[in-house]
From Swiss-Prot:
Organism: Blochmanniella pennsylvanica (strain BPEN)
Residues bearing the modification N6-carboxylysine: 216
Catalytic activity: urea + 2 H2O + H(+) = hydrogencarbonate + 2 NH4(+)
Family: Belongs to the metallo-dependent hydrolases superfamily. Urease alpha subunit family.
Keywords, sorted A to Z: Cytoplasm, Hydrolase, Metal-binding, Nickel
Keyword hit for Hydrolase: yes
Protein name according to UniProt: Urease subunit alpha
């Protein structure tokens, strides 16, 4: 007997050809393929399939997986599909059909007595997000980010020091060692970036040897051509990434001078629009070069009626400026331009800007990377219509795959960790986020880290069931005790990874090495590799890409906002 579409979806979730709305946006995803077998779907519960001799076989743990997410809709840069997900030893081991191969056909993921189940029927599963622009100002950022769906931090800092409030630099071997020891205790993947503003290499090299996975050149420490060249020379020798926040005041040169100093070498250009910093008014031109991997930070995303007003105060606090000094006011005002902020939304939609990050507590919000990414995608669909390849009103797969890559696979590629994290693919760390479609991008249901639930929406612990109020996010068993060391990863430079650093610092978490940072280009930014010729009018600040004016109106209303947040 065939089930009706409605009955089937209510039991097993949507299948091939079905469309799912994302939160209260105008974005829809359409299922492209279904790996589950009709009539042989596995489902856990009373009177359901995953029982001894039925959907559960007799095999021992070596022949079955530790965890299965059943009937999930996987949303990733490579596709939007329906499948079961198998996890073994904290890593994704299978994407396909789960069940008992003794009695069911086409089983690729075996369920046994040693298998746990997470019911993902009607749910969306994405890779844990990667925030590649984090100021380590307070450790409480970690829980805030986890509860939004972020599972990896890349950045620098030492706490609420003045330098860390402004720059993502953990300066020097001593501070890098301390921050690596702190990272070992936090339930999130972390890679630390050192200070790259120096004209001689010795002080940079010792930071990489101490474990830094990258270096940050920042105008507040000095972003001169000499410092840029020196930093990139060191990066090329050690295969690490250079993140760059260039010279807003154009004191030591203009954007052309910075590009000349870079000499075609790969850089990660932070907040490429410029409100977060960089050559005024035309730093946005850098997103058109093959060696520049451009990103945005979330306070300008998307462009709204409130964006301009809130930036001045943020600038004063984060960069230790004085509103009573005319030159400090001029510095701030030179960075806040309606025209380039408006163009930023469009450049993201066209795939010219490749990544989105937070700039946490330093002109950015650590818990809103994912939220603001999808708000921007919605705003662009409203203002610009469907993208080429999105066939119908209920199919935004091209746009959705473009935007999810901005905070998952592309920052992973940029910083040399895509072999470990950044996508829902076999062999990678099982950092997964489970969403109810109505809460997609806003409030995840479960955050899985290294194969174990690390954070979840949870009701009163004294209640008879898990759901009574007060319901809020709570850290779970995966975030506690020694379990957190088996489910999180600290990333190190190759030279540190191959040394005795982990023993010296007594690090006990999983350790990953960064690799292939220097041989990547814009063309490797998945679904976000467009390289237009960008021109910025120095008087009006209007932005053109290949001669076409790029602009959009500020939003006065956004989805994924007050409807979901009472306070």
């Amino acid at each position: 007997m065939l089930l009706s579409k409605h009955d089937y979806a209510s039991l097993f979730g949507p299948t091939i050809g079905d469309s799912v709305r994302l939160a209260d946006t105008e974005l829809w995803i359409r299922i492209e393929k279904d790996f589950t077998v009709y009539g042989e779907e596995v489902k856990f519960g009373g009177g359901k399939v995953i029982r001894d001799g039925m959907g559960q076989g007799q095999m021992s743990s070596k022949d079955c997986v530790d965890l299965v997410l059943t009937n999930a809709v996987i949303l990733d840069y490579w596709g939007i599909i329906k499948a079961d997900i198998g996890i073994n030893n904290g890593r994704i081991s299978g994407i396909g059909k789960a069940g008992n191969p003794d009695v069911q056909p086409n089983v690729t993921i075996s369920i046994g007595p040693g298998t746990e189940i997470i019911a993902a029927e009607g749910k969306i599963v994405t890779a844990g997000g990667i925030d590649a622009h984090v100021h380590f100002i307070c450790p409480q950022q970690v829980e805030e980010a986890l509860c939004s769906g972020i599972t990896t931090f890349i950045g620098g800092g030492t706490g609420p020091a003045t330098g860390s409030n402004a720059t993502t630099c953990t300066p020097g071997p001593w501070f890098i060692s301390r921050m690596l020891q702190v990272a070992d205790t936090l339930p999130i993947n972390i890679g630390v970036t050192g200070k790259g503003s120096a004209s001689f290499p010795d002080a940079l090299e010792e930071q990489i040897i101490a474990g830094a996975i990258g270096l940050k050149v920042h105008e507040d420490w000095g972003a001169t051509p000499a410092a840029i060249d020196c930093c990139l020379n060191v990066a090329d020798r050690f295969d690490i990434q250079v993140s760059m926040h260039t010279d807003t005041l154009n004191e030591s040169g203009f954007v052309e001078d910075t590009l000349s100093a870079i000499k075609g070498r790969t850089v990660h250009a932070y907040h490429t629009e410029g409100a977060g910093g960089g050559h005024s008014p035309d730093i946005i031109r850098m997103c058109g070069f093959s060696n520049v991997l451009p990103s945005s930070t979330n306070p300008t995303m998307p462009y709204t009626v409130n964006t301009i007003d809130e930036h001045l105060d943020m600038m004063m606090i984060c960069h230790n400026l004085n509103p009573n000094l005319p030159e400090d006011m001029a510095f701030s005002e030179s960075r806040i331009r309606r025209e380039t902020i408006a163009a930023e939304d469009v450049l993201h939609d066209l795939g010219a800007l490749s990544m989105i990050s937070s700039d946490s507590q330093a002109m950015g919000r650590v818990g809103e990377v994912i939220l603001r990414t999808w708000q921007t995608a919605h705003k662009m669909k409203q203002q610009r219509g469907s993208l080429l390849g999105d066939a119908t009103r209920y199919d935004d797969n091209v746009r959705v795959k473009r935007y999810i890559a901005k905070y998952t696979i592309n920052p992973a590629i940029t910083h040399g960790i895509s072999h470990e994290v950044g996508s829902v693919e076999i062999g990678k760390l099982a950092d997964l986020v489970l969403w109810s479609p109505v809460f997609f991008g806003v409030k995840p249901e479960l955050i899985i880290k290294g194969g174990m639930i690390i954070s979840s929406v949870m009701g009163d612990p004294n209640a008879s069931i898990p759901t009574p109020q007060p319901v809020h996010y709570r850290l779970m068993f995966g975030a506690r005790g020694k379990a957190k060391h088996a489910t999180r990863m600290t990333f190190l430079s190759q030279v540190a990874y191959n040394s005795e650093l982990t023993d010296y610092l007594k690090l006990v978490s999983l350790i990953g090495e960064v690799r292939h940072c220097r041989n990547i280009q814009k063309k490797h930014m998945i679904n976000n590799s467009w390289q237009p010729v960008i021109e910025v009018d120095s008087q009006t600040y209007q932005v053109r890409a290949n001669g076409e004016l790029l602009t959009c109106e500020p939003a006065s209303v956004l989805p994924m906002s007050q409807r979901y947040f009472l306070f």
